[in-house]
Amino acid sequence: MTISAWRQRLQAGGVSSRELVDEHLQRLEQSEPSLNAFVEVTAERARADADRVDQARAAGEDLGPLAGLPLAIKDNLCTRGVRTTCSSRMLEQFVPPYESTVTDRLWGAGAVLVGKTNLDEFAMGGSTETSAFGATKNPWNIEHVPGGSSGGSAAAVASGSCLASLGSDTGGSIRQPASFCGVVGLKPTYGRVSRWGLVAFASSLDQVGPFAGCVADAAELLQVIAGHDQRDSTCLTADVPNYSAGLAASIKGLRVGVIRECFEAEGLDAEVKASVQASAAQLEALGAELVDVSCPRFNDGIATYYVIAPSEASANLARYDGVKYGFRAEEAESLASMTARSRAEGFGAEVQRRILIGTYALSAGYVDAYYRKAQQVRTLIRRDFDAAFQQVDVLLTPTAPSPAFKAGAHADDPLAMYLADLLTIPVNLAGLPAISVPCGFSAAGLPIGMQLIGNVLDEARLLQVAHQYEQAADVFAQRPEASLVP
């Protein structure tokens, strides 16, 4: 059922918020031993919040659009009084004294927190295997990864542990796990949603967005979290439209650009290619016009990203030194030794690798050759998108080059892991909105996702196209059996 359908049932008295929350907590308790999707479960808080919503409803009070609905939050978003660990030993005991803007808006709309979800440490990874608290598994097949870095949020929605969740997307960390777990994942335009209270990885790339079971639910969450925030200087002041209003509108005559380079990318799985091409044909059957477009520098995105993102991470993570908060090494001989040991023991291998890459790229003698050159290529990638949007309304690609890979498959090959974000990274570099929608299954029964990319602040059109495709394709009518997916 959609958020809208649950809201109507709650308003009609067909179910109480407490019953709805208890149902999802029961699913969470059943699936969590197999999935490890959560860092912390807030069952007591969830039940108390649900009871308060029921009491307010009985008293005839006005309630928010998400009143009594169980949601989960990626554990790199600050939640006052609830641990925010970034799945790192460095922040294992950190309890924020303040609430992030997006979670504050969710609680203001009446949403109920069921827990904080697992992620790759400090959101650096594509499989949710680098978490200090153990890897998350894919609900469709626990031998496979859920994607990353927001794998816990994607797995939580797919397993029915919550109605929807929030994640963050720096290079594909919402869309790729959405594809792997068979849910909808939306990365808004950079600046559409406040980053205040999001633990920073790469500040010019990070963006918060929703995971949901359907496009309409993603639109509902975006409606609540979008909008200007004075505490985030990068947050846009543009008005927030009604994202649900145009979902039912026809897409007849809309121009959908099929990016040539994405379907010619090295390593693109044949089943993924066929499934996404079939989805493009479905859009054409709905009246959209398919247009072949070229973004010549699209596949340069990954090399560009792995200079810019680690450089920003190197600067952002310099604050973790064991002095004011975070992990502190014991019995150090000096301040310098304490700082060095705290960082060596508090950060995992992947985080340390990216800090080293970024520090090198920013070092004297190399900053021009690497960091500034990468920023120039980033500008060229953005111009390619600008040129494409002169011809079309939305762009279409696969979300990921393959379905979910097996756990441990890329453990000794960081480059192979990085390539899982080949098709999502350019969108972050350009600051554009994009959504991953389930579009089929592999022969092994693993979900496949289609990525739709919109122009700046054109989330409404993106959601419209995604919703129309979702309704027509009815992908889950032929879904395979999976014991952990309701």
UniProtKB/Swiss-Prot annotation:
Disulfide bonds: none annotated. One of its GO terms (cellular component) is glutamyl-tRNA(Gln) amidotransferase complex. Its EC number is 6.3.5.7. Coiled coil: none annotated. GO terms for molecular function: ATP binding; glutaminyl-tRNA synthase (glutamine-hydrolyzing) activity. It comes from the Bacteria. Pfam families: Amidase. It catalyses: L-glutamyl-tRNA(Gln) + L-glutamine + ATP + H2O = L-glutaminyl-tRNA(Gln) + L-glutamate + ADP + phosphate + H(+). One of its GO terms (biological process) is translation. SUPFAM superfamilies: Amidase signature (AS) enzymes. The active site is at residues 74, 149, 173. Keywords: ATP-binding, Ligase, Nucleotide-binding, Protein biosynthesis. InterPro entries: Amidase, Amidase_CS, Amidase_dom, AS_sf, GatA. Allows the formation of correctly charged Gln-tRNA(Gln) through the transamidation of misacylated Glu-tRNA(Gln) in organisms which lack glutaminyl-tRNA synthetase. The reaction takes place in the presence of glutamine and ATP through an activated gamma-phospho-Glu-tRNA(Gln). NCBIfam families: gatA. Belongs to the amidase family. GatA subfamily. PANTHER family: GLUTAMYL-TRNA(GLN) AMIDOTRANSFERASE SUBUNIT A, TRANSAMIDASE. Heterotrimer of A, B and C subunits. This is Glutamyl-tRNA(Gln) amidotransferase subunit A. It comes from Parasynechococcus marenigrum (strain WH8102). The gene is gatA.
